[in-house]
């Protein structure tokens, strides 16, 4: 049975206390709406998102990554509430899966299990450790009797710990029949989607409660819950990669972005941060290193190294306090305390301590190209644009501002001066 998916993302999200819309808040470097859209498009090609607050901003991000998404706008003034979000929604398929845009931890397998039930109305519920302000679900004889919003619950109903996860699977024809019957006769004067349960019950529709994991189906309303969710997602990301063979030393101290990829045998030490679309292939990342949108293959990085965006390392050693940016290094050793930016360095080259590629002239960036088997002495500055041919020796302390031909020794130092007995003249009388 084909499914249309509707994601509710029109709320103001005032408790998140941010100028950025709630659904654009990031977990593991990806906004929560993108996390849920990835799961949605894995299940259906008919996916719609309901927006209102900062619609243009949210729509732009959604369509950048998921251009086939249908965008709907909720009229919050005339049709507030979760049921009001469905006005104007026309599903293309036999049933509808309704999701919340602030629920990024939901797994595709859990949604598949929810869709696997053939009841006309399925409701995701969970046993809450602390029910807080969740809507309470009253179940009788394995069928949902009603959902009571916390604002409208009486004292007895507030004692119930079975709560509404806010995820529904409903027959499209049933939805079309019941939606116009929902009213706003409640404390908040809103149109509640939860009322669809009461209306379905009045028509003797069997409503199936499907129990799900509370942590996985948590909604995010403030920055504290955002941090809890990100921590939960980090554990899942690292667990997945460890099951694929990656070794993490002290994994609770590392951060791995949602789009990071590991291939082969990799090892990650404590306090490492790997971001963006970085790809680590058969490599070791040592303590307290940061890698951003870079590819590391058959290499070791760190400790205390920083690979900024667009670095490509192959068969290379990057040591402590080395920073690279937009650098392609193939079979290179850069052991310590260097900046290698906007450069290409070829195989067999050794970069001495204190080497800097001076890539910025105050207006634009320039490139340094270093060939094969080059020995770069300590405290060398390359003034880009500059090209060093193969098999060159750069003497320590040199400032290189011209191209250097193959096989040459380059030395550029100020003249030496030594004043005999100067110490005694200065400090002894």
From Swiss-Prot:
Region (Linker): 224-244
Cofactor(s), by name: Mg(2+)
Pathway where this protein functions: Nucleotide-sugar biosynthesis; UDP-N-acetyl-alpha-D-glucosamine biosynthesis; N-acetyl-alpha-D-glucosamine 1-phosphate from alpha-D-glucosamine 6-phosphate (route II): step 2/2; Nucleotide-sugar biosynthesis; UDP-N-acetyl-alpha-D-glucosamine biosynthesis; UDP-N-acetyl-alpha-D-glucosamine from N-acetyl-alpha-D-glucosamine 1-phosphate: step 1/1; Bacterial outer membrane biogenesis; LPS lipid A biosynthesis
Keyword Protease: no
UniProt-annotated binding residues for UDP-N-acetyl-alpha-D-glucosamine: 8-11, 22, 81-82, 135, 149, 164, 221, 308, 325, 339, 350
Residue numbers annotated as active site: 336
Binding site for Mg(2+): 102, 221
An individual GO BP term: lipid A biosynthetic process
Annotated EC: 2.7.7.23, 2.3.1.157
Record-level Gene Ontology MF annotations: glucosamine-1-phosphate N-acetyltransferase activity; magnesium ion binding; UDP-N-acetylglucosamine diphosphorylase activity
One Pfam family matching this protein: Hexapep
Sorted UniProt keywords: Acyltransferase, Cell shape, Cell wall biogenesis/degradation, Cytoplasm, Magnesium, Metal-binding, Multifunctional enzyme, Nucleotidyltransferase, Peptidoglycan synthesis, Repeat, Transferase
CDD domains, per the entry: GT2_GlmU_N_bac (cd02540)
Keyword Electron transport: no
NCBIfam families: glmU, PRK14359.1
Function: Catalyzes the last two sequential reactions in the de novo biosynthetic pathway for UDP-N-acetylglucosamine (UDP-GlcNAc). The C-terminal domain catalyzes the transfer of acetyl group from acetyl coenzyme A to glucosamine-1-phosphate (GlcN-1-P) to produce N-acetylglucosamine-1-phosphate (GlcNAc-1-P), which is converted into UDP-GlcNAc by the transfer of uridine 5-monophosphate (from uridine 5-triphosphate), a reaction catalyzed by the N-terminal domain.
Recorded family membership: In the N-terminal section; belongs to the N-acetylglucosamine-1-phosphate uridyltransferase family.
Protein name: Bifunctional protein GlmU
Lineage, broadest ranks: Bacteria, Pseudomonadati, Campylobacterota, Epsilonproteobacteria, Campylobacterales
Gene (UniProt): glmU
